[in-house]
Amino acid sequence: MAEPSVESSSPGGSATSDDHEFDPSADMLVHDFDDERTLEEEEMMEGETNFSSEIEDLAREGDMPIHELLSLYGYGSTVRLPEEDEEEEEEEEEGEDDEDADNDDNSGCSGENKEENIKDSSGQEDETQSSNDDPSQSVASQDAQEIIRPRRCKYFDTNSEVEEESEEDEDYIPSEDWKKEIMVGSMFQAEIPVGICRYKENEKVYENDDQLLWDPEYLPEDKVIIFLKDASRRTGDEKGVEAIPEGSHIKDNEQALYELVKCNFDTEEALRRLRFNVKAAREELSVWTEEECRNFEQGLKAYGKDFHLIQANKVRTRSVGECVAFYYMWKKSERYDFFAQQTRFGKKKYNLHPGVTDYMDRLLDESESAASSRAPSPPPTASNSSNSQSEKEDGTVSTANQNGVSSNGPGEILNKEEVKVEGLHINGPTGGNKKPLHADMDTNGYETDNLTTDPKLAHMTARNENDFDEKSERPAKRRRVNSNGKESPGSSEFFQEAVSHGKFEELENTDD
């Protein structure tokens, strides 16, 4: 079969047998052109299938024994051979023929049956010979049957399983396993090892004998109820809390029942004894004194809810049971609220206000305010001696000028090292000369003679002359000496003094 020549060219380029890169044109990219000719060409290039190899394989399989052929196709020894099936069928037929021959001995038809058996056997032999002559046909038919049969069975099996599942879902009856079983009895008891038990078989746990508190077998229940009603009946002599009437329900008075047991279940004797000990019969809690309450609260602060330690160390006049009973009564009283506020005992309760929605912020604010109230205030720092001396030297009374800035703050004071390096600060260039530019003028151009006429400045100069020896070691403040040899304040100090007091007229007088 000759291959058709493909010489037609595609829009992107020529489609020949030579390999080349496919270069799509602009039209193909714009219009999303899909050229499927390449797939067809590849299929044509593969060529037609070679049937000669398949024929050779079939011929080789025809000469192959049946067991090798089955193993080749994945069928093991589980597949039954046709010869075995035929042999089993022959044996079954022979068995049936033997039974028929035994039954027909008296009928005289044995000869005919034998002839039929011979014919049947001859026919079967012919069939076996024909099957042996054509092994390929029998194998092919057998393979087809064996391949098709399990598929059909599997299909029907799956359908049957689905049907069974659907039926089970519809008719599902829950089992009884989900019910809880009460594990009571000898079979559910744990086996305790011998080494764990601390007592022997006949050994007592404690020395004292057991005391019987109640035995329900002596008196019937109705008589016990009548006895409890008589025991709780009022005599009319009660006072205070005891005079409060009780409900109509029957109280299980353990003390009265215990008295009945001690009286050998004699109800009259038990009632007579209960009248002499009314408090014990009604189990009324005696009143605690103020000292006992105070000691109990101190014990709660010290030991918490360890009532054994509270009774042993703080409240020795009461038993542990009385302390526990008093604790639950005390917790419902106003005394507990006051105790909780003082000692923060128990859980903290927050009052809910209708105007507050975010209680977390309120809690944080309360904790911050509590922390700030507990924190000690910082001690007042002592004023620097140099600052106080400089304030005295400047003679300023007010601490702020018109702009609200301190006139002479601590930041303006210079150290010794800074003074030595920096020198004098004037309007002109900086120099190390401590004298003014002119004998009668200061650094700002004012005459020093007129400045000394001011009574305030005169007072300051007198004070500076007296403290000259003491302040010679402090070069933070510059001293300026006029032509007369007297000390005059600096221009910056005088200007600050004038501005702070608003005396600009003095500046005009000094200019004159």
From Swiss-Prot:
Modified residue annotations for Phosphothreonine: 448
Keywords carried by this UniProt record: Cytoplasm, Isopeptide bond, Nucleus, Phosphoprotein, Repressor, Transcription, Transcription regulation, Ubl conjugation
Positions of post-translational Phosphoserine modification: 10, 141, 160, 166, 367, 369, 377, 483, 488, 491
Low complexity: compositionally biased ranges: 1-16
GO BP annotations, alphabetical order: chromatin remodeling; negative regulation of transcription by RNA polymerase II; positive regulation of canonical NF-kappaB signal transduction; regulation of DNA-templated transcription
Record's signal peptide: none
ELM2 domain sequence ranges: 180-278
Tissue: Ubiquitously expressed, but at very low levels. However, consistent level of expression are observed in heart, testis, thyroid, ovary and adrenal gland. Transcripts are up-regulated in breast carcinoma cell lines and tumor.
Single GO term (MF): histone deacetylase binding
Superkingdom of source: Eukaryota
Domain SANT: from-to ranges: 283-335
SUPFAM superfamilies tied to this protein: Homeodomain-like
Function according to Swiss-Prot or TrEMBL: Transcriptional repressor regulating the expression of a number of genes including SP1 target genes. Probably functions through recruitment of HDAC1 a histone deacetylase involved in chromatin silencing.
Assembly information from the UniProt record: Interacts with HDAC1. Part of a complex containing at least CDYL, MIER1, MIER2, HDAC1 and HDAC2.
Protein name per Swiss-Prot or TrEMBL: Mesoderm induction early response protein 1
Gene (name only): MIER1
